[in-house]
Amino acid sequence: FVAMSRRVPMVFDFQGSLLAEMLDHGFIDRHSRLTSLISLVEGSINRLPNKIITSSTNARNLLIDSFNIEPERVVAISDCVDTNAFTPRPGHPEHNRSRIINRYRIPNNRLLIGYLGLLADYQGIPHLIEAAAKVIESFPGAHFLIMGYPGVETYQRMATQKGIQDHVTFTGRISYFEAPQHLAATDIAVSPKLSETEGNGKLLNYMATGLPTVAFDGEVAREYLGESGRFAVPGDHHSLAEHILELLNNATTRTCEGTSLRTRAVANFSWDRGRSQLHNIYQELLQC
């Protein structure tokens, strides 16, 4: 309303549907009376800005199709990644890897499957632990490095109940500045996120690090990973485990897919590219 009263253009950063995320997180029931009210309020807010920026084409289509926003007002600018910070095995690769595995007392002969992000059910962590049990049963040389918070104790108990506690390490919270070296110490990355209404920025960090990546299939995952990603059936831990096992058993495939994803990240998702797109939007509005 301040922008309207001063007659200055307003740009809205759309991170996902409020109603859809409240339903995803279980804050309200789909049949609640609040559902219609929240949808009405959200729609009104979405119609206020001169331009809306989304982090994926999927989110752009949601605004156009579900909220009837004019296509010319909605611009998809993907989440971006610092491809200079997130690199494949930065610095002295063996030294960095050794530092990480020594820090967490992981046997140095294991292949690491990494996850970096929030620990929550909607992020698919229970599915990841179920998949880990299947993977470790078939490939005892695998180790899962699960980086993030909260809920560490909850998921640790889940891993213990599966009998895989010696093959799963929970690091807790990792600072942004430590994230590149932690990811570079891993061999495979995984993102079992279930929500289709949000972005999935962790995929870009994986890609920039040159990690072969397995994700649950979805529009956002395919938009980011392209043809070089591996897509498991959503919510199916057996499918997730199968894709991880295929990568564990083929070093050449891991290298090829990781290199391809790194190239894609640099070409399409770098900070420089995103900065340029944002600059052009603001310039357009200032000239109106």
Where are the language model's segments positioned?
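Nucleotide-activated donor-binding/catalytic signature segment of Leloir-type glycosyltransferases, i.e.
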Residues: T154-E178
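Glycosyltransferase donor-sugar binding loop
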Residues: L116, H143-Q156
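Membrane-proximal helix-turn-helix segments that form the acceptor-binding/catalytic region
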Residues: M4-S5, L18-L19, S32-I52, S66
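A short helix/loop element that forms part of the nucleotide-sugar donor recognition site in Leloir-type
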Residues: T87-I106, T253
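Conserved acidic donor-binding segment of nucleotide-sugar-dependent glycosyltransferases
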Residues: G229-H238, E246-T252
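Acidic donor-binding loop of glycosyltransferase active sites
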Residues: N50, H167, Q181-E198, L211
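Carbohydrate-associated surface elements
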Residues: N58, C80
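Conserved donor-binding/catalytic core segment of Leloir-type glycosyltransferases
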Residues: P107-A132, L145
